[in-house]
């Protein structure tokens, strides 16, 4: 039945479904997991890296975490070439807003603008939708710390804690069970690592397979900080999710 209606993004099935958009969401389900948790003093993003190699230049490459502006960052799951286009679009929009109004772009306004672009690609004939989902973490003076999730359809929503990528439903269920409204940033890191350790396909959790980033306030200014492999390893040991190396012990 679907073959009659999935050749173009502009054709609805009799059930009102856009199959090309659903196929894009299937691609995200095969990508590495990413988890975002909003706390009272920051937002934490943790992602599972699928590409791991000793030859990879980790200092210049990132698979899951990207800084958009000084006050906004994102985690991605899906087709990375699609993600790069949208991330660059978001960066340009944020800089244009800052240039025009001399203040940072509100987080939700930036997310909505990018999602308008994503939604447009579900209406153009001959163009596939973007096969990528995002978790946006940010802070602005109006609403403080915020976490948004968007999917290939262009839909977005604000969340206290959210998961995208492989096994996202299991991760979402665990977050719903363990999340507290008064959670701190340190507790959010521990929770995100715990959830990811139980939903990843890999049997062992190491810094080579993870990326972690935080958005928080430091001396009254918003700061984006990507966690180094060494610090991430110490966090995993502290959480009891991995054994200390011979050098550390």
Swiss-Prot record:
Domain of life: Eukaryota
One BP term from GO: ubiquitin-dependent protein catabolic process
Taxonomic path: Eukaryota, Viridiplantae, Streptophyta, Embryophyta, Tracheophyta
Keyword Secreted recorded: no
Listed name of the protein: Proteasome subunit alpha type-4
Pfam family for this entry, one: Proteasome_A_N
Protein's cellular compartments: Cytoplasm; Nucleus
Function: The proteasome is a multicatalytic proteinase complex which is characterized by its ability to cleave peptides with Arg, Phe, Tyr, Leu, and Glu adjacent to the leaving group at neutral or slightly basic pH. The proteasome has an ATP-dependent proteolytic activity.
Cellular compartments per GO CC: cytoplasm; nucleus; proteasome core complex, alpha-subunit complex
Known partners and oligomeric status: The 26S proteasome consists of a 20S proteasome core and two 19S regulatory subunits. The 20S proteasome core is composed of 28 subunits that are arranged in four stacked rings, resulting in a barrel-shaped structure. The two end rings are each formed by seven alpha subunits, and the two central rings are each formed by seven beta subunits. The catalytic chamber with the active sites is on the inside of the barrel.
Keywords: Cytoplasm, Nucleus, Proteasome
The family this protein is said to belong to: Belongs to the peptidase T1A family.
The keyword Plastid appears for this protein: no
Predominant location category: cytoplasm
Cysteine-cysteine disulfides: none
